[in-house]
């Protein structure tokens, strides 16, 4: 299995690869590991995660909400792009899949930025609303 952007033309992919920084070593290892996973096709492509990271930098985002973590490629890429005080709220229901993510977050040195909620995202969203955090996110994916 390979992880690739399915809706991008070869020209667009070449452009994105040319303007984006090199893939972080922790992301490269996670991508390779995820590609071997039986559900590996669920992962975002490196170019998609790079666009998310670019949006973080472009908008000076500090708080990011992710619904559906899988093995953590996009959450790791975003956490790397966030400022040191930035935070990721990550929602998923599968502890086995997110174990890959936890390992990647540690390896990339961003685990301290990420709060993983292992329950249906609707419950986490309800909790965030009840805590008065309706307007606290700069970017969601």
Q: Residues of each region from the PLM?
A:
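A short alpha-helical cap/connector motif
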Residues: 1-141
């Amino acid at each position: 299995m390979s992880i690739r952007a399915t809706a991008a033309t070869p020209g667009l992919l070449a452009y994105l690869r040319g303007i984006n920084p090199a893939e972080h070593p922790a992301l490269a290892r996670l991508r390779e590991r995820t590609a071997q996973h039986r559900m590996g096709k669920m992962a975002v492509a490196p170019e998609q995660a790079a666009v998310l990271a670019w949006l973080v930098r472009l908008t000076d985002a500090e708080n990011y909400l992710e619904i559906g973590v899988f093995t953590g490629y996009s959450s790791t890429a975003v956490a790397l792009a966030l400022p040191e005080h930035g935070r990721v709220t990550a929602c998923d229901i599968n502890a086995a899949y997110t174990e890959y993510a936890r390992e990647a977050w540690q390896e990339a040195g961003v685990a301290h930025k990420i709060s993983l909620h292992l329950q249906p995202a609707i419950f986490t969203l309800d909790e965030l609303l009840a805590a008065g955090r309706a307007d606290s996110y700069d970017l969601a994916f």
